[in-house]
Amino acid sequence: MNLQGRTVLVLGLGETGLSMAKWLFRRGALVRAADTRNEPPAMRAFNSLLPQAEVFTGSLAGRAFYGVDLIAISPGLPLSEPLVQQALKEGIPVVGDMELFACAVGGTGGGMPKLVGITGSNGKTTVTAMTGAMLKKAGWDVEVAGNIGPAVLDALMRREDTGKMPQAWVLELSSFQLETTKSLGLDAAAVLNVSEDHLDRYAGMQEYAAAKARIFLGDSEGVQILNGDDPVVRQMTLAGRPHVTFSLATPQSADDFGLLREGGDTWLMQGDTRLMDARELAITGRHNCANALAALALCRALAVPFEPLLQALREFRGLPHRVEKVAAFSGITFYDDSKGTNVGATVAALKGLGQPVVLIAGGDGKAQNFSPLAAPIGEHGRAVVLIGRDAEKIAVAINECGVPLHRAQTMEEAVRKSFQLAREGDAVLMSPACASFDMFDNYVHRAEAFVAAVRSMQAARAGGNSAGVAGRH
Protein backbone atom coordinates (compact mmCIF):
# COMPACT_ATOMS: atom_id res chain seq x y z
CA MET A 1 0.00 0.00 0.00
CA ASN A 2 1.62 3.23 -1.19
CA LEU A 3 0.75 5.97 1.30
CA GLN A 4 3.16 8.65 0.10
CA GLY A 5 1.32 11.95 -0.34
CA ARG A 6 -2.12 10.45 0.30
CA THR A 7 -4.54 12.26 2.60
CA VAL A 8 -5.56 9.92 5.41
CA LEU A 9 -8.12 10.58 8.13
CA VAL A 10 -7.43 8.79 11.41
CA LEU A 11 -10.67 8.23 13.33
CA GLY A 12 -10.14 7.91 17.07
CA LEU A 13 -7.18 9.20 19.06
CA GLY A 14 -6.60 6.46 21.60
CA GLU A 15 -3.63 4.09 21.67
CA THR A 16 -4.51 2.43 18.36
CA GLY A 17 -5.36 5.69 16.61
CA LEU A 18 -2.08 7.27 17.66
CA SER A 19 -0.14 4.22 16.47
CA MET A 20 -1.84 4.47 13.06
CA ALA A 21 -1.06 8.19 12.87
CA LYS A 22 2.62 7.55 13.61
CA TRP A 23 2.75 4.72 11.07
CA LEU A 24 1.02 6.76 8.35
CA PHE A 25 3.25 9.77 8.98
CA ARG A 26 6.31 7.53 8.75
CA ARG A 27 5.04 6.32 5.37
CA GLY A 28 4.68 9.84 4.01
CA ALA A 29 0.92 10.24 4.31
CA LEU A 30 -0.79 13.57 4.95
CA VAL A 31 -2.54 12.84 8.24
CA ARG A 32 -5.54 14.47 9.86
CA ALA A 33 -7.53 13.13 12.82
CA ALA A 34 -11.02 13.19 14.30
CA ASP A 35 -12.47 11.91 17.57
CA THR A 36 -15.97 12.07 19.02
CA ARG A 37 -14.48 12.93 22.42
CA ASN A 38 -13.67 16.55 23.22
CA GLU A 39 -10.37 15.57 24.86
CA PRO A 40 -9.10 12.31 23.33
CA PRO A 41 -6.47 10.52 25.44
CA ALA A 42 -3.75 10.72 22.76
CA MET A 43 -4.48 14.29 21.66
CA ARG A 44 -1.35 15.80 23.19
CA ALA A 45 0.91 13.12 21.72
CA PHE A 46 -0.70 13.56 18.29
CA ASN A 47 -0.23 17.34 18.36
CA SER A 48 3.40 16.86 19.37
CA LEU A 49 3.98 14.45 16.49
CA LEU A 50 2.04 16.44 13.89
CA PRO A 51 1.72 20.05 15.09
CA GLN A 52 0.42 21.24 11.71
CA ALA A 53 -2.18 18.51 11.29
CA GLU A 54 -5.90 19.22 11.45
CA VAL A 55 -7.76 17.69 14.39
CA PHE A 56 -11.54 17.58 14.72
CA THR A 57 -13.03 16.79 18.15
CA GLY A 58 -16.57 16.39 19.41
CA SER A 59 -19.26 15.02 17.11
CA LEU A 60 -17.88 13.87 13.75
CA ALA A 61 -18.07 16.63 11.15
CA GLY A 62 -18.36 16.19 7.40
CA ARG A 63 -15.48 18.58 6.78
CA ALA A 64 -13.09 16.12 8.42
CA PHE A 65 -13.84 13.67 5.60
CA TYR A 66 -13.45 16.16 2.75
CA GLY A 67 -10.77 15.20 0.23
CA VAL A 68 -9.51 12.10 2.03
CA ASP A 69 -8.06 9.15 0.11
CA LEU A 70 -8.17 6.67 2.98
CA ILE A 71 -9.78 6.35 6.42
CA ALA A 72 -7.88 4.60 9.22
CA ILE A 73 -10.50 3.78 11.84
CA SER A 74 -9.90 2.83 15.46
CA PRO A 75 -11.63 -0.35 16.69
CA GLY A 76 -13.80 1.56 19.15
CA LEU A 77 -15.66 3.33 16.34
CA PRO A 78 -18.26 1.26 14.45
CA LEU A 79 -18.38 1.12 10.68
CA SER A 80 -22.09 1.97 10.99
CA GLU A 81 -21.17 5.59 11.77
CA PRO A 82 -23.15 7.54 9.09
CA LEU A 83 -20.20 9.55 7.77
CA VAL A 84 -18.11 6.37 7.53
CA GLN A 85 -20.92 4.67 5.61
CA GLN A 86 -21.09 7.64 3.26
CA ALA A 87 -17.35 7.43 2.67
CA LEU A 88 -17.63 3.73 1.85
CA LYS A 89 -20.40 4.48 -0.66
CA GLU A 90 -18.08 7.01 -2.29
CA GLY A 91 -15.41 4.34 -2.66
CA ILE A 92 -13.06 5.60 0.03
CA PRO A 93 -11.27 2.62 1.62
CA VAL A 94 -11.68 2.17 5.38
CA VAL A 95 -9.00 0.15 7.16
CA GLY A 96 -7.84 -0.53 10.71
CA ASP A 97 -4.44 -1.06 12.25
CA MET A 98 -4.39 -4.79 11.48
CA GLU A 99 -5.03 -4.20 7.78
CA LEU A 100 -2.22 -1.62 7.67
CA PHE A 101 0.00 -4.19 9.40
CA ALA A 102 -1.04 -6.92 6.95
CA CYS A 103 -0.18 -4.74 3.97
CA ALA A 104 3.22 -3.94 5.51
CA VAL A 105 4.32 -7.49 6.35
CA GLY A 106 2.76 -9.26 3.37
CA GLY A 107 5.05 -10.55 0.67
CA THR A 108 8.17 -10.66 2.81
CA GLY A 109 9.09 -13.99 1.22
CA GLY A 110 10.89 -16.96 2.67
CA GLY A 111 7.92 -17.97 4.80
CA MET A 112 8.94 -15.65 7.64
CA PRO A 113 7.73 -14.14 9.77
CA LYS A 114 4.99 -16.59 10.67
CA LEU A 115 1.66 -15.00 11.52
CA VAL A 116 -0.50 -16.45 14.29
CA GLY A 117 -3.86 -14.98 15.25
CA ILE A 118 -6.31 -15.62 18.06
CA THR A 119 -9.88 -14.41 18.51
CA GLY A 120 -12.89 -15.46 20.56
CA SER A 121 -15.37 -14.07 23.03
CA ASN A 122 -13.32 -15.34 25.97
CA GLY A 123 -9.78 -16.53 26.62
CA LYS A 124 -8.10 -14.82 23.68
CA THR A 125 -5.70 -12.71 25.77
CA THR A 126 -4.67 -15.73 27.82
CA VAL A 127 -4.16 -17.92 24.74
CA THR A 128 -2.22 -15.14 22.99
CA ALA A 129 0.13 -14.72 25.96
CA MET A 130 0.39 -18.49 26.39
CA THR A 131 1.22 -19.06 22.71
CA GLY A 132 3.87 -16.35 22.80
CA ALA A 133 5.45 -17.86 25.92
CA MET A 134 5.46 -21.33 24.36
CA LEU A 135 7.15 -20.19 21.15
CA LYS A 136 9.73 -18.24 23.15
CA LYS A 137 10.44 -21.34 25.22
CA ALA A 138 11.08 -23.16 21.94
CA GLY A 139 13.74 -20.57 21.07
CA TRP A 140 11.73 -18.44 18.65
CA ASP A 141 12.04 -14.66 18.42
CA VAL A 142 8.39 -13.70 18.96
CA GLU A 143 6.44 -10.45 19.00
CA VAL A 144 3.12 -10.55 20.87
CA ALA A 145 0.84 -7.64 19.99
CA GLY A 146 -2.64 -6.50 19.04
CA ASN A 147 -5.62 -6.25 21.34
CA ILE A 148 -3.43 -7.59 24.19
CA GLY A 149 -1.09 -4.60 23.76
CA PRO A 150 1.11 -3.12 22.49
CA ALA A 151 -0.69 -1.85 19.39
CA VAL A 152 0.59 -3.88 16.47
CA LEU A 153 1.90 -0.89 14.50
CA ASP A 154 3.86 0.36 17.52
CA ALA A 155 5.45 -3.08 17.76
CA LEU A 156 6.18 -3.10 14.02
CA MET A 157 7.81 0.34 14.11
CA ARG A 158 9.96 -0.73 17.05
CA ARG A 159 11.07 -3.79 15.07
CA GLU A 160 11.81 -1.62 12.04
CA ASP A 161 13.97 0.64 14.19
CA THR A 162 16.01 -2.33 15.43
CA GLY A 163 16.32 -3.73 11.90
CA LYS A 164 15.22 -7.18 13.04
CA MET A 165 11.85 -8.73 12.32
CA PRO A 166 10.61 -11.56 14.58
CA GLN A 167 10.26 -15.17 13.49
CA ALA A 168 6.61 -15.02 14.49
CA TRP A 169 3.92 -12.47 15.25
CA VAL A 170 1.33 -13.68 17.74
CA LEU A 171 -1.69 -11.40 17.47
CA GLU A 172 -4.78 -11.04 19.62
CA LEU A 173 -7.63 -9.92 17.37
CA SER A 174 -10.92 -8.47 18.58
CA SER A 175 -14.07 -8.61 16.49
CA PHE A 176 -13.82 -4.82 16.18
CA GLN A 177 -10.36 -5.11 14.61
CA LEU A 178 -11.44 -7.93 12.32
CA GLU A 179 -14.27 -5.83 10.86
CA THR A 180 -11.68 -3.87 8.86
CA THR A 181 -9.18 -6.68 8.24
CA LYS A 182 -9.15 -8.81 5.10
CA SER A 183 -5.52 -9.42 4.12
CA LEU A 184 -3.76 -10.99 7.12
CA GLY A 185 -3.38 -14.47 5.64
CA LEU A 186 -2.46 -16.09 8.95
CA ASP A 187 -0.34 -19.25 9.08
CA ALA A 188 -2.40 -20.43 12.06
CA ALA A 189 -5.63 -18.85 13.26
CA ALA A 190 -7.85 -19.81 16.18
CA VAL A 191 -11.43 -19.02 17.08
CA LEU A 192 -11.72 -20.06 20.71
CA ASN A 193 -15.47 -19.62 21.22
CA VAL A 194 -18.39 -17.38 20.35
CA SER A 195 -20.84 -16.33 23.05
CA GLU A 196 -23.01 -13.26 23.46
CA ASP A 197 -20.96 -10.08 23.66
CA HIS A 198 -20.97 -6.59 22.15
CA LEU A 199 -24.62 -6.91 21.11
CA ASP A 200 -24.86 -3.17 21.67
CA ARG A 201 -22.68 -2.92 18.53
CA TYR A 202 -23.87 -5.87 16.43
CA ALA A 203 -27.38 -6.56 15.12
CA GLY A 204 -27.23 -10.07 16.57
CA MET A 205 -25.13 -13.15 17.13
CA GLN A 206 -24.90 -13.94 13.41
CA GLU A 207 -23.28 -10.59 12.63
CA TYR A 208 -20.96 -10.90 15.64
CA ALA A 209 -19.88 -14.43 14.63
CA ALA A 210 -19.31 -13.27 11.05
CA ALA A 211 -16.88 -10.64 12.35
CA LYS A 212 -14.97 -13.32 14.26
CA ALA A 213 -14.84 -15.57 11.17
CA ARG A 214 -12.99 -12.83 9.26
CA ILE A 215 -9.82 -14.06 10.98
CA PHE A 216 -9.66 -16.71 8.24
CA LEU A 217 -9.67 -14.19 5.37
CA GLY A 218 -6.60 -13.48 3.27
CA ASP A 219 -4.57 -15.34 0.69
CA SER A 220 -3.59 -18.17 2.98
CA GLU A 221 -3.59 -21.92 3.30
CA GLY A 222 -3.04 -21.50 7.01
CA VAL A 223 -4.37 -23.93 9.57
CA GLN A 224 -7.76 -23.25 11.15
CA ILE A 225 -7.83 -23.99 14.89
CA LEU A 226 -11.47 -24.49 15.89
CA ASN A 227 -13.30 -25.18 19.15
CA GLY A 228 -14.92 -28.53 18.53
CA ASP A 229 -17.32 -28.00 21.44
CA ASP A 230 -18.77 -24.78 20.00
CA PRO A 231 -21.32 -25.31 17.18
CA VAL A 232 -20.99 -21.70 15.99
CA VAL A 233 -17.22 -22.08 15.65
CA ARG A 234 -17.47 -25.49 13.95
CA GLN A 235 -19.53 -23.87 11.20
CA MET A 236 -16.52 -21.70 10.31
CA THR A 237 -14.67 -24.69 8.82
CA LEU A 238 -13.59 -23.83 5.26
CA ALA A 239 -13.54 -26.47 2.55
CA GLY A 240 -10.03 -27.26 1.37
CA ARG A 241 -8.32 -25.59 4.35
CA PRO A 242 -6.42 -27.68 6.90
CA HIS A 243 -8.12 -27.55 10.27
CA VAL A 244 -7.57 -28.91 13.76
CA THR A 245 -10.07 -28.95 16.62
CA PHE A 246 -9.59 -28.70 20.36
CA SER A 247 -12.20 -29.95 22.80
CA LEU A 248 -12.84 -30.83 26.42
CA ALA A 249 -13.90 -34.26 25.15
CA THR A 250 -11.73 -37.10 23.84
CA PRO A 251 -10.07 -36.23 20.48
CA GLN A 252 -11.90 -37.61 17.46
CA SER A 253 -8.88 -37.84 15.14
CA ALA A 254 -5.10 -38.15 15.34
CA ASP A 255 -4.59 -34.43 14.65
CA ASP A 256 -7.17 -33.10 17.10
CA PHE A 257 -6.59 -32.05 20.70
CA GLY A 258 -8.75 -32.91 23.72
CA LEU A 259 -8.96 -34.38 27.21
CA LEU A 260 -8.94 -37.95 28.45
CA ARG A 261 -10.46 -38.66 31.86
CA GLU A 262 -9.18 -41.85 33.41
CA GLY A 263 -9.90 -42.66 37.02
CA GLY A 264 -9.21 -39.46 38.90
CA ASP A 265 -6.78 -38.14 36.29
CA THR A 266 -7.31 -35.79 33.35
CA TRP A 267 -4.83 -35.86 30.47
CA LEU A 268 -4.20 -33.33 27.72
CA MET A 269 -4.19 -35.33 24.50
CA GLN A 270 -3.48 -35.14 20.79
CA GLY A 271 -5.26 -38.04 19.20
CA ASP A 272 -4.32 -41.10 21.27
CA THR A 273 -1.13 -39.51 22.63
CA ARG A 274 -1.00 -38.37 26.24
CA LEU A 275 0.79 -35.03 26.45
CA MET A 276 0.60 -34.04 30.12
CA ASP A 277 -1.49 -34.43 33.24
CA ALA A 278 -3.82 -31.44 33.59
CA ARG A 279 -2.67 -31.10 37.21
CA GLU A 280 0.74 -30.03 35.89
CA LEU A 281 -0.77 -26.81 34.55
CA ALA A 282 0.03 -23.83 36.75
CA ILE A 283 -3.39 -22.34 35.98
CA THR A 284 -6.57 -24.04 37.09
CA GLY A 285 -10.02 -24.68 35.66
CA ARG A 286 -11.50 -26.54 32.70
CA HIS A 287 -11.49 -23.33 30.64
CA ASN A 288 -7.71 -23.14 31.06
CA CYS A 289 -7.38 -26.73 29.84
CA ALA A 290 -9.18 -25.56 26.70
CA ASN A 291 -6.87 -22.54 26.47
CA ALA A 292 -3.80 -24.78 26.76
CA LEU A 293 -5.10 -27.13 24.06
CA ALA A 294 -5.75 -24.22 21.69
CA ALA A 295 -2.26 -22.83 22.26
CA LEU A 296 -0.73 -26.26 21.65
CA ALA A 297 -2.66 -26.58 18.39
CA LEU A 298 -1.45 -23.16 17.23
CA CYS A 299 2.19 -23.92 17.99
CA ARG A 300 2.05 -27.39 16.45
CA ALA A 301 0.63 -25.82 13.28
CA LEU A 302 4.07 -24.18 13.01
CA ALA A 303 5.75 -27.59 13.48
CA VAL A 304 7.23 -26.70 16.88
CA PRO A 305 8.22 -29.81 18.92
CA PHE A 306 6.14 -30.69 21.97
CA GLU A 307 8.82 -30.73 24.68
CA PRO A 308 9.40 -26.96 25.08
CA LEU A 309 5.69 -26.26 24.58
CA LEU A 310 4.68 -28.51 27.46
CA GLN A 311 7.41 -27.09 29.69
CA ALA A 312 6.13 -23.57 28.96
CA LEU A 313 2.62 -24.65 29.94
CA ARG A 314 3.91 -25.95 33.26
CA GLU A 315 5.48 -22.54 33.92
CA PHE A 316 2.69 -20.26 32.63
CA ARG A 317 1.10 -18.51 35.62
CA GLY A 318 -1.79 -16.78 33.89
CA LEU A 319 -2.70 -13.10 33.56
CA PRO A 320 -4.09 -10.56 36.03
CA HIS A 321 -7.86 -10.22 36.53
CA ARG A 322 -8.68 -13.60 34.97
CA VAL A 323 -9.89 -15.81 37.85
CA GLU A 324 -6.85 -14.55 39.75
CA LYS A 325 -6.57 -15.58 43.40
CA VAL A 326 -6.48 -12.45 45.52
CA ALA A 327 -6.58 -13.74 49.09
CA ALA A 328 -7.70 -16.58 51.33
CA PHE A 329 -8.79 -16.13 54.94
CA SER A 330 -11.44 -17.48 57.30
CA GLY A 331 -11.68 -20.52 55.05
CA ILE A 332 -12.82 -18.47 52.05
CA THR A 333 -10.87 -17.82 48.84
CA PHE A 334 -11.36 -14.60 46.86
CA TYR A 335 -10.94 -14.49 43.07
CA ASP A 336 -10.70 -11.48 40.77
CA ASP A 337 -12.20 -12.16 37.33
CA SER A 338 -12.84 -8.54 36.39
CA LYS A 339 -11.87 -9.36 32.79
CA GLY A 340 -14.99 -11.57 32.70
CA THR A 341 -16.99 -8.95 30.83
CA ASN A 342 -19.56 -11.24 29.22
CA VAL A 343 -21.83 -14.11 30.17
CA GLY A 344 -19.64 -16.79 28.58
CA ALA A 345 -16.62 -15.77 30.65
CA THR A 346 -18.56 -15.91 33.90
CA VAL A 347 -20.08 -19.29 33.03
CA ALA A 348 -16.56 -20.65 32.40
CA ALA A 349 -15.30 -19.23 35.70
CA LEU A 350 -18.19 -20.72 37.68
CA LYS A 351 -17.64 -24.15 36.15
CA GLY A 352 -13.87 -24.00 36.48
CA LEU A 353 -13.39 -23.32 40.20
CA GLY A 354 -14.69 -26.65 41.44
CA GLN A 355 -16.09 -25.29 44.72
CA PRO A 356 -19.25 -23.47 45.91
CA VAL A 357 -19.23 -19.83 44.84
CA VAL A 358 -20.66 -16.55 46.05
CA LEU A 359 -20.75 -14.57 42.82
CA ILE A 360 -20.41 -10.80 42.51
CA ALA A 361 -21.80 -9.78 39.10
CA GLY A 362 -23.28 -6.81 37.28
CA GLY A 363 -22.44 -3.62 35.43
CA ASP A 364 -23.06 -2.51 31.86
CA GLY A 365 -24.66 -5.57 30.26
CA LYS A 366 -24.06 -4.60 26.61
CA ALA A 367 -27.56 -5.88 25.66
CA GLN A 368 -26.67 -9.49 26.53
CA ASN A 369 -29.08 -12.27 27.39
CA PHE A 370 -28.20 -13.22 30.98
CA SER A 371 -30.36 -16.35 31.21
CA PRO A 372 -27.41 -18.74 30.45
CA LEU A 373 -26.03 -17.78 33.88
CA ALA A 374 -28.94 -19.41 35.69
CA ALA A 375 -27.96 -23.07 35.31
CA PRO A 376 -24.27 -22.79 36.36
CA ILE A 377 -25.24 -20.51 39.25
CA GLY A 378 -27.81 -23.08 40.32
CA GLU A 379 -25.18 -25.81 40.16
CA HIS A 380 -22.19 -24.01 41.67
CA GLY A 381 -23.59 -20.93 43.43
CA ARG A 382 -24.05 -20.30 47.14
CA ALA A 383 -25.47 -16.82 46.54
CA VAL A 384 -25.25 -13.91 44.10
CA VAL A 385 -24.55 -10.27 44.93
CA LEU A 386 -25.53 -7.94 42.09
CA ILE A 387 -24.07 -4.51 41.41
CA GLY A 388 -24.26 -1.89 38.70
CA ARG A 389 -26.65 -0.54 36.12
CA ASP A 390 -28.03 -3.84 34.86
CA ALA A 391 -28.35 -5.61 38.22
CA GLU A 392 -32.14 -5.85 37.90
CA LYS A 393 -31.93 -7.26 34.36
CA ILE A 394 -29.64 -9.99 35.63
CA ALA A 395 -31.91 -10.66 38.60
CA VAL A 396 -34.91 -11.17 36.31
CA ALA A 397 -32.93 -13.45 33.97
CA ILE A 398 -31.61 -15.71 36.75
CA ASN A 399 -34.57 -15.53 39.11
CA GLU A 400 -35.18 -19.29 38.85
CA CYS A 401 -31.57 -20.26 39.60
CA GLY A 402 -32.47 -21.42 43.09
CA VAL A 403 -29.90 -19.43 45.08
CA PRO A 404 -30.44 -16.18 47.04
CA LEU A 405 -29.97 -12.90 45.14
CA HIS A 406 -28.72 -9.80 46.93
CA ARG A 407 -28.01 -6.21 45.87
CA ALA A 408 -25.09 -3.89 46.67
CA GLN A 409 -24.51 -0.27 45.75
CA THR A 410 -20.71 -0.34 45.90
CA MET A 411 -17.95 -2.89 45.46
CA GLU A 412 -17.05 -2.57 49.14
CA GLU A 413 -20.62 -3.45 50.13
CA ALA A 414 -20.64 -6.34 47.64
CA VAL A 415 -17.47 -7.83 49.13
CA ARG A 416 -18.76 -7.42 52.67
CA LYS A 417 -22.07 -9.13 51.86
CA SER A 418 -20.32 -11.90 49.94
CA PHE A 419 -18.07 -12.65 52.90
CA GLN A 420 -21.10 -12.85 55.18
CA LEU A 421 -22.87 -15.22 52.78
CA ALA A 422 -19.90 -17.52 52.14
CA ARG A 423 -19.14 -20.64 54.13
CA GLU A 424 -15.84 -22.29 54.90
CA GLY A 425 -14.50 -23.90 51.71
CA ASP A 426 -16.38 -21.48 49.44
CA ALA A 427 -15.02 -19.00 46.92
CA VAL A 428 -16.04 -15.38 46.48
CA LEU A 429 -15.78 -14.78 42.75
CA MET A 430 -16.02 -11.30 41.26
CA SER A 431 -16.87 -12.16 37.65
CA PRO A 432 -19.25 -9.44 36.51
CA ALA A 433 -20.40 -10.76 33.08
CA CYS A 434 -20.61 -7.06 32.20
CA ALA A 435 -18.53 -4.09 31.15
CA SER A 436 -17.35 -1.79 33.92
CA PHE A 437 -18.02 1.70 32.58
CA ASP A 438 -21.21 2.36 34.57
CA MET A 439 -19.28 2.39 37.87
CA PHE A 440 -15.56 2.33 37.02
CA ASP A 441 -13.02 3.72 34.56
CA ASN A 442 -12.32 0.25 33.16
CA TYR A 443 -12.06 -3.40 34.21
CA VAL A 444 -8.68 -2.76 35.90
CA HIS A 445 -10.20 -0.02 38.06
CA ARG A 446 -13.03 -2.42 38.97
CA ALA A 447 -10.48 -5.07 39.93
CA GLU A 448 -8.57 -2.58 42.06
CA ALA A 449 -11.77 -1.72 43.94
CA PHE A 450 -12.45 -5.41 44.57
CA VAL A 451 -8.91 -6.15 45.73
CA ALA A 452 -8.88 -3.09 48.00
CA ALA A 453 -12.14 -4.17 49.63
CA VAL A 454 -10.86 -7.72 50.14
CA ARG A 455 -7.53 -6.51 51.57
CA SER A 456 -9.31 -4.13 53.93
CA MET A 457 -11.51 -6.93 55.22
CA GLN A 458 -8.52 -9.26 55.56
CA ALA A 459 -6.63 -6.64 57.57
CA ALA A 460 -9.62 -6.10 59.83
CA ARG A 461 -9.91 -9.83 60.49
CA ALA A 462 -6.18 -10.12 61.21
CA GLY A 463 -6.46 -7.22 63.62
CA GLY A 464 -8.75 -9.17 65.88
CA ASN A 465 -12.12 -8.24 64.41
CA SER A 466 -12.92 -11.91 63.87
CA ALA A 467 -16.07 -13.77 64.74
CA GLY A 468 -14.98 -16.96 62.96
CA VAL A 469 -16.62 -18.32 59.87
CA ALA A 470 -18.65 -20.94 61.70
CA GLY A 471 -20.08 -18.30 63.98
CA ARG A 472 -21.61 -16.45 61.06
CA HIS A 473 -23.82 -19.32 59.89
UniProtKB/Swiss-Prot annotation:
Its annotated pathway reads:
Cell wall biogenesis; peptidoglycan biosynthesis
A single Gene Ontology CC term: cytoplasm
On whether Cell inner membrane is a keyword of this UniProt record, the answer is: no
Enumerate the residues binding ATP.
120-126
Catalysed reaction, written as an equation:
UDP-N-acetyl-alpha-D-muramoyl-L-alanine + D-glutamate + ATP = UDP-N-acetyl-alpha-D-muramoyl-L-alanyl-D-glutamate + ADP + phosphate + H(+)
User: Which Gene Ontology BP terms does the record give?
Assistant: cell division; cell wall organization; peptidoglycan biosynthetic process; regulation of cell shape
**Assigned EC number:** 6.3.2.9
Q: Does the keyword Protein biosynthesis apply?
A: no
Q: Where in the cell is it found?
A: Cytoplasm
Which keywords label this protein?
Answer: ATP-binding, Cell cycle, Cell division, Cell shape, Cell wall biogenesis/degradation, Cytoplasm, Ligase, Nucleotide-binding, Peptidoglycan synthesis
One of the record's GO molecular function terms: ATP binding
Q: Which coarse location class describes where this protein primarily resides? A: cytoplasm
Please state which protein family the record places this protein in: Belongs to the MurCDEF family.
Query: What biological function has been recorded for the protein in this entry?
Result: Cell wall formation. Catalyzes the addition of glutamate to the nucleotide precursor UDP-N-acetylmuramoyl-L-alanine (UMA).
Full protein name: UDP-N-acetylmuramoylalanine--D-glutamate ligase
Organism of origin: Nitrosospira multiformis (strain ATCC 25196 / NCIMB 11849 / C 71)
